[in-house]
Amino acid sequence: MRARLISYNGTTMYDLLKTIDDPADLRRLDRRQLQPLADELRAFVLDSVSKTGGHLSSNLGTVELTIALHYVFNTPNDRIVWDVGHQTYPHKILTGRRDQMHSLRQYDGISGFPRRSESEYDTFGTAHSSTSISAALGMAIGSQLNGDDRFSIAVIGDGAMTAGMAFEAMNNAGVSEDAKLLVILNDNDMSISPPVGALNRHLARLMSGRFYAAARAGVERVLSVAPPVLELARKLEEHAKGMVVPATLFEEFGFNYIGPIDGHDLDSLIPTLQNIRELRGPQFLHVVTKKGQGYKLAEADPVLYHGPGKFNPAEGIKPSPTPAKKTYTQVFGEWLCDEAERDSRVVGITPAMREGSGMVEFEKRFKDRYYDVGIAEQHAVTFAGGLATEGLKPVVAIYSTFLQRAYDQLIHDVALQNLPVVFAIDRAGLVGADGATHAGAYDLAFMRCIPNMTIMAASDENECRQMLHTALQQPNPTAVRYPRGAGTGVATVKEFTEIPLGKGEVRRRTSQPEGKRVAILAFGTMVAPSLAAGEELDATVANMRFVKPIDAALVRELAETHDYLVTVEEGCVMGGAGSACVEALMESGVIRPVIQLGLPDQFIDHGDPAKLLAQCGLDGAGIAKSIRERFLSPAADVADQAKRVA
């Protein structure tokens, strides 16, 4: 039973799928019903994602594997950890969330990733990659210690095997001889950017070797001659590779390697998993799937259909009209190419995010200076440090949330040695549909405490370009943060201008009398809503530009000429940019009431970014409301007068 192409007409009835409310219902089906169910499930995934947006290619590729796992194993007693977690839509549909898929990645809807608080079947949250083997091993050992008899299964794919953490876990797991642990490599040759490196080439050689293919075919012919042996041959299908290629990379880690097998063939998947279920010790199953499986358009262009917005499945994704505003990612990509044209020492580095970070054009034009290191953020940062020691100008393009994974390297390998590495930090602040796991809420706080760091936050497209240029001129590690999505509509200037180090600018001055003068000290994306609040309240607004070094002179000047100060940032308040202003204020000896506005001390869920910012009080109306209630209301006047008398 193998996957078939979807004939999408929008009228699929889902007769079988409607009967599945949990995996127990699935396990009651006859084996012959599973492929029709897979066809319905694949069509349902396509129909759902086309209406909400989300990850499509990888989910179309996990349909049969998901069905087989829940059919063979006793979930949720047996644990499944999905890695990367965006390949779990079929899993969510089969585990009681079919009728919630219309809310996928929407405000107050279900998450696009596994979430423990959402379902008992979501055993571990996995939105960042390469964590599944560690988590599943912990579950397997924990079950042993608790005396529980259950399997722990890590499904790892989408480039996640390129990360060192996966191999650290395998190294540990390989000596756990009694652990009921299964690692499934979902080999679909698909990370967000194509997988890279020696490991990927090794896997490709294993799968495409003519000797293995010919030998396997010969073994199967021999075994199938005698009918009594035929069933044995089928049961031992997963061991065929071991008969001709005995020592694999994974066996060296202490795993029993099985495969590769067709991840879209239920007649191969189910008996293989049933056999594995009877084994003890760490098992490694190599499953080959196809991204976009069953939907011709996604099969032809899996990158385009990796994470689409809403579209008509019958027509496919249509080219969007050129937007009026550039995205910050586009601004970065254009800047990097311009700098590389001017200076042959400029080198671009990405940890498997070529498209997402805007480096497609750079790779085309400067291939010898482009390095995609795979999902290896720690290596990316230290690699950049090494390049810097040789007089090159490395630029690390990285999402804020993924820079967290390389914090020690940022401190020990780059900042401690004061190496001139530029960090272009994309997706800073809230990121919308991807939610808390991908929010760039912490970069200002965790970088600000590191000696030798310079940190800038861009308020518009041209400022982003000029900040990146300024960063490239610095003799020390420098970060420029900018948000996901479109800018404010400001045109970028081709000519480069270096921004004075540690200097902000006043964008608006108040005309209020003494006692009513408010100064808003805004950072990055919060400059625009702060200007809106400033217009409403007639407040001074400063674009602070630098988080480190903070413009202490401007902080003091605003404190001396205003009655109240407000700091606004799209990041966590604790330890962030506002804290830098308060520290500078304390150093100045000028005492003024201060409000620090930013992201609250909680994880912000997925949803429309504008709605989420408003919920956090970080739109123009919310900023004005906070200022009015704290400083400008009659009650605030009474409280202020009482403090002055005291």
Swiss-Prot record:
One GO term of the cellular component aspect?
Answer: cytosol
Please tell me which top-level EC class this enzyme sits in.
Answer: transferase
Q: Which domain of life is it from?
A: Bacteria
Cofactor(s) of this protein: Mg(2+); thiamine diphosphate
Positions of Mg(2+) binding:
158, 188
Q: What EC designation does it have?
A: 2.2.1.7
Q: By its UniProt entry, which SUPFAM superfamilies does this protein fall under?
A: Thiamin diphosphate-binding fold (THDP-binding), TK C-terminal domain-like
Listed GO MF terms: 1-deoxy-D-xylulose-5-phosphate synthase activity; magnesium ion binding; thiamine pyrophosphate binding
**What reaction is this protein's catalytic activity?**
D-glyceraldehyde 3-phosphate + pyruvate + H(+) = 1-deoxy-D-xylulose 5-phosphate + CO2
Q: Can you cite a GO biological process for this protein?
A: 1-deoxy-D-xylulose 5-phosphate biosynthetic process
Residues holding thiamine diphosphate: 86, 127-129, 159-160, 188, 295, 377
Any idea what job this protein has?
A: Catalyzes the acyloin condensation reaction between C atoms 2 and 3 of pyruvate and glyceraldehyde 3-phosphate to yield 1-deoxy-D-xylulose-5-phosphate (DXP).
Protein family per UniProt: Belongs to the transketolase family. DXPS subfamily.
Q: How does it assemble?
A: Homodimer.
Which protein, by its recorded name, is this? Answer: 1-deoxy-D-xylulose-5-phosphate synthase
Recite the lineage of the species.
Bacteria, Pseudomonadati, Pseudomonadota, Betaproteobacteria, Burkholderiales
